[in-house]
A protein has these predicted regions:
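Charged, glycine-rich intrinsically disordered N-terminal tails and low-complexity linkers that flank
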Residues: 1-55, 59
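Mg2+/Mn2+-dependent nuclease catalytic core
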Residues: 59-61, 67-137
Length: 137
């Protein structure tokens, strides 16, 4: 896996990320095309679940570790697929094994209390699969 620092501005139109995988599986390919081509602006600054996720990432990692005894390491980089550099991933962290080596992807999501667990899993399954492919976990 190639790693590119998030400190550099990543042009999201230059690759396919995990959220994009969700759009593709949901059949929203036209919406994704318009975003990638710059025909519509993707402004997530007022999307509450996105903002909650950004502002609570550290807490979510700590909470997961407290509940599972599995440490989570923050990932501060945009990951690139080792063969296809247009396949990208911005993961919330790595779940570590007893040797403190990555054994899985940590991805926290904010949903409302009325959303059923099966619905959440179905919605985000493509994104997590995408992240596991890119991170090789």
């Amino acid at each position: 896996m190639n790693i590119q620092s998030q400190k550099k501005v990543i042009d999201r139109s230059s690759g396919i990320g995990g959220s994009d995988a969700n759009l593709l599986v949901a059949g929203k390919w036209k919406e994704l095309y318009e975003i990638k081509k710059g025909l519509v602006e993707e402004d997530l600054s007022f999307v509450l679940p996105v903002q909650l996720g950004i502002h609570t990432e550290s807490f979510n990692r700590e909470w997961f570790t407290a509940q599972t005894d599995l440490p989570v390491q923050e990932c501060e980089y945009t990951l690139m697929h080792k063969k296809y550099d247009y396949i990208l991933a911005n993961i919330d962290g790595y779940v570590l094994n007893e040797n403190l080596k990555p054994m899985g992807v940590f991805e926290a999501k904010h949903t409302n209390m009325m959303t059923k667990e099966d619905t959440i899993i179905e919605k985000y399954y493509p994104q997590v699969q995408h992240y596991m492919m890119v991170s090789n976990t």
